[in-house]
């Protein structure tokens, strides 16, 4: 979490590795990835075994982040549906696929006051359609 003591994959992997437990694993999320200023590039994952990444959450982000002092507020109130922000989600999912990660779960984590304010039905449909579009582009096999 970019606003925490474990701000990026490098530190997260160091914690998991130091734990030396079979069930210690990582979850990846494009909001956290982008806000940690990590490039969407396999080089970031090169030292991490694919089986140590258990799950991914997908969403998208605004181009301009909240101020560092309130970045957590963006995380808790202003995430975007996959493919509707800076457009990082499809490339993020492609990177996961290319690494050979086989997530036990692919979750959608769109935490957005603005989207929810349009009603639960709108939020569900908007998030579903956005997610489906990204997965059809980046990793259609997971939809089968």
Enumerate the language-model features and the residues they cover.
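Histidine-acidic metal/acid-base catalytic patches
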Residues: 9-28, 34-144
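Short, flexible loop segments at the rims of nucleotide/cofactor-binding pockets, characterized by
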Residues: 3-4, 32-34
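Surface-exposed cleft-lining segments at the edges of enzyme active sites
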Residues: 1-4, 79-80
